[in-house]
């Protein structure tokens, strides 16, 4: 049986299906810029505390390891939240869920500016992490569903580039304003900017065309989806491990470099340390670059190169000159964003079903790396100083290099 135009019914259905967002189209760029704003808000609201950790130690009388909990509580809560959000989002509007998450997390950040006690600050930071959980997994799933595969690498790169802009802006703005005024004013400013980014995101994001809410999915269906992602493709669990490794090493380095630069012989102020964090902008370049390279050279090669660049950066931070430390931080940042963009895009391509759930598993590992390794780094800092922190990160990345090499072999064999 054929359709009136001579095509088969299946072909007719394909012809009438909603079009994907083609690279270069107006809708493609609206979606990419909207997710860039979402990435900015997520990372700025999450990581602005890193340059403020020494201030928290002074104000609240806590150790560096305890101060790092201001970030670990957020990323730990976010790890749980993205895991749940990946499932919940299968039955809800992606647009509304992401907007509500960004709005609530911005408001909680404003409230945190007035927290009088350390434990209250930690509770607010944990709630912020929970609120942000509706963005990362859902954003990745939105792009994987709506963007044509030929343009997915660049779109995912721009989204991760928004993370880089947010991470840089959050750190620099918080550090400079804390030095000029107080850390409370710095936090309030971050919250206001988060609200502005949320409004821009809401106005720009095109509606979903290829997502149909699936209400009433029970635990059995979710468990089956998890089993498919963990056992169906051998590459997916390794990519989840890469997320843990990349994020764990990256966050640990940023958590404690401020303590190093505040202490002699550097004795820098917060504004100067914040200026050094401008090197975070290399992530804006790294993410789209890695997307283009992955599309042309293969994801495995880009992932290996990303880890090698991070290892070289860690080695540079062991040198004494400030310029060498800044270059090392820049290398680690470039390698991290290139690797994260590549790995996250790879997950989206390998997960043929339940993309939101696959993204949730990836981000669960990603933020657990931040929470667990980031806090563990405080013990290495207290015991061995910067050499201990660098050794921890280098060991982790060496394991990541082995995993990336295995993924490259799978890619060359055609399995991935």
Model-assigned labels for residue ranges:
Residues 108, 119-128, 323-331:
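Paired small-residue
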Residues 15-25, 206-240:
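Juxtamembrane intracellular "pre-TM" segments in multi-pass secondary transporters
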Residues 300-343:
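C-terminal transmembrane helical hairpin of 12-TM major facilitator-type secondary transporters
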Residues 82-93, 285-298, 381:
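Helix-to-loop junctions at the C-terminal end of transmembrane segments
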Residues 80-119:
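Conserved MFS/SLC helix-loop-helix module at the cytosolic interface between two early adjacent transmembrane helices
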Residues 96-110, 301-315, 394:
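Structural signature of the two symmetry-related core transmembrane helices
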Residues 124-165:
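Cytoplasmic helix-loop-helix junction between adjacent transmembrane helices
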